[in-house]
């Protein structure tokens, strides 16, 4: 690289000025939501970005169009130009690209380490918690953007208003989803940390010990400087339990009477949520939030608490929430279609933990009480299905019709008795509903064609490839005749 080229890049690379020796950053598994977001921000910083994945998707297409070099399949030659290799915990250490990088003394770092470098020179706002991270990150981003603060953001899902899951902004603010699934959020050193809730999930990371998980969240909060800010949902019993152990300034939020930022008078009409937020020494805010569910009202209140501390104008908060389009695959309304047997509404949701499924069902019931709720559920990971088996059974029999797919393994080995067929059998045995087991996504459309009725709300639910199924059903407009032909 010439001296002139180095000077040009120095002008562009404002986020991590000390990374001047880094030219090419390679991402193993670049098509994932978390990886692609960081890659896109660094691409906009002027770095040469390369990455590999097993197959093309909308993310890899977008990155390629922006100038990234994309490889399909994993091989040692992919890292020849790399100054550093970024990996997620989903990538096996025996991956040939990781092996080649280590043999050639190319640094191999985790995704969160690179995110931490992006955050190091910025006012970082990290959003953590078992549930609600993606939506809360999107809501906070929307408010800051509406206020003209032009934040950089890196989210685990699509921010619909922005049309992307990551963007390089011009201000000092960086808003990012903080992932506890592999404890890698401990690399982050933000100025503000949100904790939405804490439940048992990803327990393999924590040796099956919930106390270890709780301590990890405390350690995450103590990564804040002494002048930093923790924003914590006091409605969550585990978060409330941990409050006395947090030695940083804390703002609490929730429906609880003792919350510093309190949500009251909640009601839902269709997809919109209406509620009032009370803040100490500030005017109450009467909110219209353009997404359904009490859980999303809580997510919005977290974002309001953060924005209020930054003295964001109330008008910007109100406008941002009214115009919020949601996050990708979070109660994502794909349309209402004439099926050939009346009209039906199609909604897609990423929730894959019993608590997430439960609040999604409640939001659907509250907004569309007159509709029959038909859920197509795909369990995610055998270990999660095993660990939360009874909780899944308790939640899933609250729909009117349940179509159960088999487990999306996410690379795990099958566990006896922790699959879709077994879960289906357990729910049937309770006598409340009679679920239908469909072993593959390919076999589902003709089954659905025989189930769908006038006025149904069809809800595809899960973190696996059931999201692709939702898009397929939308492309067919839920047409019964088309779906039958796929049988």
Curated annotation (Swiss-Prot):
ATP binds at residues 129-135. GO terms for molecular function: ATP binding; UDP-N-acetylmuramate-L-alanine ligase activity. Its EC number is 6.3.2.8. Its main location: cytoplasm. Pathway: Cell wall biogenesis; peptidoglycan biosynthesis. It catalyses: UDP-N-acetyl-alpha-D-muramate + L-alanine + ATP = UDP-N-acetyl-alpha-D-muramoyl-L-alanine + ADP + phosphate + H(+). GO terms for cellular component: cytoplasm. One of its GO terms (biological process) is cell wall organization. Keywords: ATP-binding, Cell cycle, Cell division, Cell shape, Cell wall biogenesis/degradation, Cytoplasm, Ligase, Nucleotide-binding, Peptidoglycan synthesis. It is found in: Cytoplasm. Belongs to the MurCDEF family. This is UDP-N-acetylmuramate--L-alanine ligase.
């Amino acid at each position: 690289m010439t001296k002139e080229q180095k000077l040009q890049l120095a002008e562009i690379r404002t986020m991590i000025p000390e990374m001047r020796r880094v030219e090419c950053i390679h991402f193993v598994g670049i098509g994932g939501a978390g990886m692609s977001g960081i890659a896109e921000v660094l691409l906009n910083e002027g770095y040469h970005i390369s990455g590999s994945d097993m197959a093309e998707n909308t993310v890899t297409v977008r990155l390629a169009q922006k100038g990234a070099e994309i490889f399909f399949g994993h091989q040692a030659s992919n890292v020849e130009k790399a100054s550093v290799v970024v990996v997620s915990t989903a990538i096996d250490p025996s991956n040939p690209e990781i092996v080649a990088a280590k043999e050639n003394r190319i640094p191999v770092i985790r995704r969160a380490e690179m995110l931490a470098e992006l955050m190091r020179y910025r006012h970082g706002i990290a959003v953590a918690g078992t549930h609600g991270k993606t939506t809360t990150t999107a809501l906070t981003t929307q408010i800051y953007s509406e206020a003209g603060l032009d934040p950089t953001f890196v989210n685990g899902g699509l921010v619909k208003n922005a049309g992307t899951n990551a963007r390089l902004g011009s201000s000092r603010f960086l808003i990012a989803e903080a992932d506890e699934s592999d404890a890698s959020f401990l690399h982050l050193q933000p100025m503000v940390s949100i904790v939405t809730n804490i439940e048992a999930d990803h327990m393999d990371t924590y040796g099956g010990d919930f106390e270890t998980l709780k301590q990890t969240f405390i350690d995450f909060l103590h990564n804040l400087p002494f002048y930093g800010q923790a924003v914590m949902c006091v409605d969550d019993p585990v978060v409330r339990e941990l409050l006395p152990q947090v030695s940083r300034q804390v703002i609490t939020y929730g429906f609880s009477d003792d919350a510093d930022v309190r949500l009251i008078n909640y009601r839902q009409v269709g997809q919109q949520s209406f509620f009032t937020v009370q803040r100490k020494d500030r005017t109450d805010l009467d909110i219209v939030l353009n997404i359904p569910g009490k859980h999303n009202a809580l997510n919005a209140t977290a974002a309001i608490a953060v924005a209020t501390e930054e003295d964001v104008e109330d008008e910007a908060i109100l406008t941002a929430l009214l115009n919020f389009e949601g996050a990708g695959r979070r109660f994502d309304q794909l349309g209402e279609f004439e099926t050939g047997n009346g009209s039906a509404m199609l909604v897609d949701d990423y929730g894959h933990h019993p608590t997430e499924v439960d609040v999604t069902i409640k939001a659907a019931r509250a907004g569309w009480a007159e509709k029959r709720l038909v859920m197509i559920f795909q369990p995610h990971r055998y270990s999660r299905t095993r660990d939360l088996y009874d909780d899944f059974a308790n939640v899933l029999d609250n729909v009117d019709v349940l179509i159960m797919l088999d487990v999306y393994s996410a690379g795990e080995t099958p566990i006896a008795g922790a699959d879709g067929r077994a879960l289906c059998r357990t729910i049937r045995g309770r006598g409340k509903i009679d679920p239908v087991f469909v072993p593959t996504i390919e076999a589902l459309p003709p089954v659905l064609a025989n189930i769908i009725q006038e006025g149904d709300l069809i809800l595809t639910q899960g973190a696996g490839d059931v999201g692709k199924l939702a898009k397929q059903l939308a492309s067919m407009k839920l047409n019964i005749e088309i779906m039958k032909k796929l049988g």
